[in-house]
Regions:
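Contiguous segments within soluble domain cores/interaction surfaces
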Residues: 2-104, 108-138
Length: 138
């Protein structure tokens, strides 16, 4: 299985006919009114695989604070049928990651095969900042 895209969006929704409708993708920063805050981050994940494999994948999205503390996670899985006669299959998801942000900083959001996996090549840095009230009406 190969990850084609993994990033947050300002908003994202799966379409009935397949695909995702996303705005603000990729999201390059997140603003909150106050700390601490509980936020939900729409994540877009696109994958492909060869037919004949990866029928019931399970993935985990984990958010960590700038200090490395886990501040949110979710598990998602699906049954992935082959698409004959095409030798490859594609899937795109929108997952909504709940996370607690306690202070401004760069949070990390990673895609993992297990909740206990230490490292991943799919890691997205997300700066979380406090909203500047002087710029709120711009």
């Amino acid at each position: 299985m190969r990850v084609v895209a993994f990033a947050p969006a300002l908003s994202a929704a799966e379409q009935n006919g397949g695909g995702v409708n996303a705005k603000g993708f990729p999201m390059t920063s997140c603003f909150v009114d106050n700390f601490p805050a509980q936020i939900t981050v729409p994540m877009v994940i696109a994958l492909c695989a060869l037919g004949g494999a990866d029928y019931d994948p399970v993935k985990y999205i984990v958010a960590t604070s700038p200090e490395g503390e886990r501040v949110g996670s979710l598990e998602f899985s699906w049954h992935w049928h082959d698409n004959p006669p095409t030798p490859v299959k594609f899937r795109v998801f929108t997952q909504y990651l709940p996370m607690r942000v306690s202070a401004a900083g760069v949070y990390s959001i990673g895609l993992y095969d297990s909740l206990h996996q230490a490292d991943t090549e799919y890691l997205y840095p997300l700066p979380v900042l406090k909203t500047n009230p002087l710029l709120a009406n711009r």
